């Protein structure tokens, strides 16, 4: 395999999509818009930050496009050439100290055999349709948190050892650093009505088209937007969690299931508005969680549970020293 991945013919990189508590909208595959769409006059908020409900759909799509830099779809292949493969989950590129790899949910990768020549072949789908096949010999699977009977906690880190493949990924995408303290991250992104987004590749949107000997996989990089509520954050046995509530009904286009989003990143957002021209900008953002569980409350309500800040910046890594 070439050290520099090319655009594979059998992959169509997903459109960036955006969602909210009650709805999700699909965006065409275009570059981020430079100007926000027409909208009502936005009132100034305390600290000049805006709630996600004040943010136009076009700008939410732009945020999803920007955060795609860190997103990966996880794929499994039966052979080293990855001619037959399946997409089975989501993840995010991270760096912890001198380690580079993919942070995801443990249940997504617990059956993968890695570390030797006769192990399984893993591949990553990066932004703009780049696909990187990772030979098992350059991968180390770290079980950061093995789920118990209640399906918690649930974290794993697939370390990518120094290799041409790691170099290729670093040239294309970005690795989020996890060396900041969880206290500092919490200061800027924890609070009632603070916006956040859950990102992944829902299986409900996967399509497989076979034309002769060629298999086309179509997947969608999807962003769902929320605001932190009174009961969104909780802690059990030292692990902290955040939940995103999805309500069905009306004209929303939420997927019936969030299967495939497991392992995907949760990002905290700070969105500001220029007082002079009203233009919106993503002031800053931070990785604040990893999604791992969907909970069906009723026909009209489904919750997505994710590990939160302390878990992914501190607690999960203690076993690695």
Label each region the model flagged:
Residues 251, 281-321:
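C-terminal cap/linker of serine protease catalytic domains
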Residues 176-223:
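Short glycine/Trp-rich loop-beta-loop segment that forms part of the substrate-binding cleft
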Residues 2-90, 95-96:
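Protease-domain processing segments flanking chymotrypsin-fold serine proteases, especially trypsin-like
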Residues 152-180, 192-200:
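Internal, conserved structured core segments that host functional sites
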Residues 251-285:
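Catalytic nucleophile loop of clan PA
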């Amino acid at each position: 395999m070439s050290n520099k991945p090319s655009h594979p013919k059998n992959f169509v990189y997903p459109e960036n999509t955006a969602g909210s508590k009650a709805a999700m909208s699909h965006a065409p595959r275009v570059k981020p818009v430079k100007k926000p769409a027409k909208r009502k006059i936005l009132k100034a908020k305390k600290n000049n930050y805006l709630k996600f409900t004040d943010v136009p759909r076009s700008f939410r799509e732009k945020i999803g496009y920007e955060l795609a830099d860190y997103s990966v779809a996880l794929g499994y292949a039966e052979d080293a050439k990855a001619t037959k493969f399946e997409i089975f989950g989501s993840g995010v590129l991270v760096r912890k100290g001198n380690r580079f790899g993919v942070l995801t949910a443990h249940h997504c990768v617990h059956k993968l055999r890695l570390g030797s020549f006769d192990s399984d072949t893993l591949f990553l789908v990066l932004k703009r349709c780049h696909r990187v096949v990772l030979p098992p010999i350059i991968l180390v699977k770290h079980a950061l948190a093995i789920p118990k009977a209640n399906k918690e906690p649930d974290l794993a880190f697939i370390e990518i050892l120094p290799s041409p493949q790691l170099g290729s990924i670093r040239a294309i995408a970005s690795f989020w650093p996890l060396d900041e303290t969880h206290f500092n991250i919490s200061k800027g992104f924890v609070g009632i009505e603070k916006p956040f987004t859950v990102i992944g590749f829902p299986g409900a949107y996967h399509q497989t088209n076979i034309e002769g000997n060629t298999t086309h996989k179509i997947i969608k990089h999807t962003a769902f937007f929320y605001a932190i509520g009174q009961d969104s954050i909780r802690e059990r046995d030292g692990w902290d969690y955040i939940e995103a509530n999805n309500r069905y009904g009306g004209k929303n286009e939420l997927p019936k299931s969030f299967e495939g989003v497991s392992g995907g990143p949760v990002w905290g957002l700070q969105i500001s508005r220029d007082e002079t021209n009203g233009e919106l900008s993503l002031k800053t953002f931070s990785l604040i969680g990893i999604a791992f569980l969907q909970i069906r409350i009723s026909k009209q309500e489904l919750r997505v549970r994710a590990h939160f800040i302390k878990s992914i910046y501190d607690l999960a890594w203690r076993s690695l020293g």
